[in-house]
From Swiss-Prot:
BP term (GO), one: protein ubiquitination
Enzyme class: transferase
The protein's name: E3 ubiquitin-protein ligase ATL41
Disulfide bond residue pairs: none
Note on domains (UniProt): The RING-type zinc finger domain mediates binding to an E2 ubiquitin-conjugating enzyme.
Organism: Arabidopsis thaliana (Mouse-ear cress)
């Protein structure tokens, strides 16, 4: 065997080892195409979902803008504390026997300590609960209700009675007079009704009396000629 044949065989073996088998190449290409296609499909699906989400959010924003202001904020915001001027206007006093407040029986619900004599306290106008001035003032800066009963601390406006026309004493007198007039009218109407009921009975009785009188007179008249005839016969 010559050296040329050996070189040619070596070249062919090197060539086959460098270039893969066509069947494996086709398999790898198919796998690559499937991966690219699947990745492209996932990208398209994600893009479609993104567009759909943007569309839905835009529709919701437009619908939300079209609603009235009342429906945009269905939940009320928590109320803040009172104005410092309102807090300062609340009544204060010094705890002691002269104020009518027993120091040992009253407890501040904010600091959970008993009110002592000569302590400066504040009374809430609507619920009449008593606290230390410093304690309740600190509470009212962040909350507008009583710490105990949750009643609004801000003083309520007093409703003044409407002025009445005319003196007050005239109304009962008018009522009494009208009642008296009604009773007099009722009595007169009842008496007139009684008269109208009794008058036919009295007329009937008088008519009966007249009839009896006429009958008695007729009987007397009929009996008188008979007696005259008897007297004449006796004479003859």
């Amino acid at each position: 065997m010559s050296s040329n044949d050996r070189d040619h065989r070596r070249f062919n073996s090197d060539h086959h080892s460098f270039w893969p088998n066509p069947s494996t190449y086709d398999l790898n290409s198919k796998i690559m195409l499937a991966a690219v296609a699947s990745l492209s499909g996932v990208i398209l699906i994600v893009f479609a979902l993104h567009l759909y989400a943007r569309f839905v959010l835009r529709r919701r924003r437009e619908a939300f803008r079209g609603l009235p202001v009342i429906f945009r904020h269905p939940f009320e915001m928590p109320k803040r504390g009172l104005n410092p001027t309102v807090i300062a206007s609340l009544p204060t006093f010094t705890v002691g026997a002269t104020d009518g407040v027993a120091a040992s029986a009253t407890e501040c619900a904010v600091c959970l300590s008993v009110l002592k004599e000569q302590d400066k306290a504040r009374e809430l106008p609507n619920c009449k609960h008593i606290f230390h001035v410093d304690c309740v003032d600190t509470w009212l800066t962040t909350c507008s209700t009583c710490p105990v009963c949750r009643t609004e601390v801000e003083p309520r406006p007093r409703l003044e009675p409407e002025p009445r026309e005319g003196p007050v004493g005239t109304a009962p007198q008018l009522l009494v007079e009208t009642r008296l007039n009604l009773t007099v009218e009722a009595a007169s109407s009842s008496s007139s009704d009684n008269k109208t009921v009794v008058s036919p009975a009295s007329r009937l009785n008088s008519f009966r009396k007249i009839l009896t009188r006429e009958r008695s007179s007729n009987r007397i008249n009929h009996s008188c000629p008979d007696q005259d005839r008897v007297a004449d016969l006796e004479r003859h």
